[in-house]
């Protein structure tokens, strides 16, 4: 019998609907190394396995680029200075962390509030934006912006602009009087999606991948490879990327079995606390 980790997503009826091509350039954001070291220690077996996993991912340096938080933050800062914003809205935990990391270097975001949002597969090949808290996006924004003067500045902060679904939804739900004084900040994104967001308000991005989304350029988080946070599905348990072997084959052809095995072992270590 195959391990539970291997079989968890094997019978998915929707797997073909979310096929991934092999991109010409794949960016992998390392949001895993520091977390593993902090949780289990830099000398732990899990930390050693994490280093081995990244060495494996980097075997194709012409096509796979590993990004660190620090270098992306510096690239955002290099785009130009800003006066402190009156309010910053971080999209999800990731956006909140980006806002905090930027503020630590610049002082731009003295007030940061999180919006509870995530993207979810609908099982039919599409994605929908859903709240992770018991309030709609409109209700969350109404609460955060209650009494917010139209003269004050607003920052909306996320980690990635991929399809642009999340950011466009947030911006289009903002009160019209607030949008003209809104600025988006993001660590990385697909250039065409960034351009679509920029039609709504100014955008500052650290790393912009040029070309067609998925085919030419793609972005993934390393945490999603290992932890069951990468794939969220409507009314079904979340999956890690390694539980969709066809995705790993597309992203890391020729070494997909090694990547899956390393991710599975690391997932087990993190689940067991060892």
Segment roles from a protein language model:
Residues 2-57, 83-84, 101, 105-108, ...:
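PRPP-dependent phosphoribosyltransferase catalytic core
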Residues 49-68, 157-159:
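Glycine-rich phosphate-binding "P-loop"
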Residues 59-85:
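A short, well-structured juxtamembrane/interface segment
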Residues 84-92:
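Short glycine-rich phosphate-binding loop at a beta-alpha junction
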Residues 87, 153-155:
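Structural motif
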Residues 91-93, 117, 186-189:
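Cofactor-binding loop segments of dinucleotide-utilizing enzymes, especially the Rossmann-like FAD-
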Residues 95, 160-165:
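Short acidic, S/G/P-rich loop/turn micro-motifs used as interaction or catalytic elements
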Residues 107-153, 164-168:
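Short, glycine/charge-rich flexible loops or terminal/linker lids adjacent to PRPP-binding catalytic cores
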């Amino acid at each position: 019998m195959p391990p539970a980790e291997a079989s968890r997503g094997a019978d998915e009826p929707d797997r073909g609907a979310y096929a991934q091509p092999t991109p010409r350039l794949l960016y992998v954001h390392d949001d895993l190394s520091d977390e593993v070291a902090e949780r289990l220690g830099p000398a732990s077996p899990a930390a050693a396995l994490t280093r081995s996993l990244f060495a494996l991912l980097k075997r194709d340096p012409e096509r796979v680029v590993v990004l660190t938080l620090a270098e992306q933050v510096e690239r955002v800062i290099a785009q130009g200075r800003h006066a402190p914003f009156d309010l910053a809205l971080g999209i999800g935990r990731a956006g909140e962390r980006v806002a905090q990391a930027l503020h630590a270097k610049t002082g731009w975001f003295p007030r940061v509030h999180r919006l509870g949002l995530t993207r979810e597969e609908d099982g039919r090949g599409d994605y929908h934006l859903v709240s992770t808290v018991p309030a709609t996006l409109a209700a969350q924004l109404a609460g955060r912006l209650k009494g917010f003067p139209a003269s004050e500045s607003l920052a909306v902060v996320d980690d990635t602009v991929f399809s642009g679904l999340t950011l466009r939804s947030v911006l289009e739900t903002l009160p019209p009087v607030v949008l003209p004084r809104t600025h988006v900040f993001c660590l990385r994104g697909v250039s065409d999606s960034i351009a679509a967001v920029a039609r709504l308000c100014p955008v500052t991005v650290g790393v912009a991948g040029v070309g067609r989304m998925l085919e030419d350029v793609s972005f993934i988080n390393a945490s999603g490879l290992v932890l069951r946070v990468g794939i969220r599905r409507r009314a079904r348990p979340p999956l890690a990327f390694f539980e969709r072997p066809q995705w790993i084959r597309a992203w890391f052809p020729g070494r997909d079995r090694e990547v899956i095995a390393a991710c599975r072992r690391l997932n087990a270590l993190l689940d067991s606390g060892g």
